[in-house]
């Protein structure tokens, strides 16, 4: 086996606090066969909660996947014991023998017909050929998947799957040599942390939370609050009066500069107002909330709760699907300038090739254009997509193609 990158041979942190077993299933590595170097398998810390479980960088690991050269072979009555070396270490692998039906199949009392005898003999010859071709000896490359366990105070792998690797030009070994450093970099060397502590750390890490992070965190908390309370519409100032949200928005933030970090406090009401405004803007971009009229002092509507919007969009799709040869008119910015110090934008409706078809239905952009022109509401594409998904879940409409919808 080629020598692995030395930077990837990281040891499991012995000082890291063990994550409660309740959260192990949240780590994808827990259910996977972890492709680790043998050196790391031998040095993993064993769990104090569940025997037979091990930790690498906080990742709970029980099953592993290794590939290496066989350096020793011991045959027992029911299993083989292979010593496998991947150039980082050597580990013993217990590989159970496949059950043989030679004795039972050769019993003449069982084989009643010549056809059965012929079939059995052919299967026996095939089995013998497979065993000869796949017989594993010293120097062969073997791949083993199995469970890590302790036997006589030594760590070994109890195989569930194992096979000889036919790799005369080292294609599979080189591919694995390139794969493992990437897995270590993207998965195994990224510590798995207790999910229950993430929220608390985010709230308590005032020295490291920047303005963008605070805005994103506040938007998530606002979203959770609206969902929990089943709010249909609200004003921004109403959210600013909610104590947990206000406390979060008023915490200190860190602004990075070229040479150092300067801590600024959002004590002023205007700063809190600005953070809430930015957080709601994020929710608008994601389509979770919308406004019928622009302005932070205007009423916000929760997209999933506004039945009036759902009904209007459904009616637009239902009516326009019955109008063949109808082309979509999309608002396009035609001129931008200033008048008396104020920005002025002139928009014109232009015909774009997005027809309404009786079979395919209405295009998403056609529906959005109808809402903007007829209702004059401040909607974006994300809001419309949220509504279309809700209507489709309720079986009111169906998607007939790429961004095309029709109503029942």
From Swiss-Prot:
Tagged with keyword DNA-binding: yes
Top-level taxon of the source organism: Eukaryota
GO cellular component: chromosome, telomeric region; CST complex; nucleus
DNA-binding region extent: 64-165
SUPFAM superfamilies linked to this entry: Nucleic acid-binding proteins, Winged helix' DNA-binding domain
Cell location: Nucleus; Chromosome, Telomere
Protein family membership: Belongs to the STN1 family.
Protein name: CST complex subunit STN1
Organism the protein comes from: Rattus norvegicus (Rat)
Gene name in the database record: Stn1
